Amino acid sequence: MPHIVLPLGISFFTFTQSAYLVDVYRGEAVNSSFAAYCEFVTIFPHLIAGPIINYKEMLPQFLADKTFKIYYDNLAMGISIFAMGLFKKVAIADKLAIWANAAFSHTESLTFLEAWIGALSYTFQLYFDFSGYSEMAIGLGLMFNLKLPINFNSPYQAASIIDFWRRWHMTLGSWVRDYLYIPMGGNRRGEFAKMRNLFVSMMIIGLWHGAGWTFVLWGGTWLGIDG
């Protein structure tokens, strides 16, 4: 695919807004108001790397009086979570990126050991990078008395590929389930339809991680491995 420069946070903004429109169409976005909608679209901490927020889940927090007050417990906890995420990103992910980039920059001459070091480095770099950004967003949100959803739950401790995707980028998985997989029929229309819906869902997840056919195939491969 050609290199295209996209606006910052376009994927998260698109996902949250499309989910909002679907919820309005379904009549599930109750008590919606222009003020609440403005608050929803101007929440900035999650726009870099998630989590994906849902209007129905965030609305009660917008309507609560405590959202507009200063709570020092939330402020302290938010700073701690933000610092933890920043440490993951800067001290771990960025350091692992050096090893990963070194391996991928000369793939034609890699030894067996170097290939494994590069693969493992990128595996953990991806996790600490994504989860670090998500924790920074959660911490920053908590400073504003907003509880954003948890996005990662020890995915590399998963017992299966399906369990892995329930732990990895959890808000993306929930979005795909609620607004793509289930509306397409889920597992209610026979085995072929179920596999088709799963395949489309996993390809969308793969494409979300990167705008290239390699990521699309990556998403489909995970499904094939689990099957």
Segment roles from a protein language model:
Residues M1-G227:
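Membrane-embedded transmembrane alpha-helical bundles that form the catalytic cores
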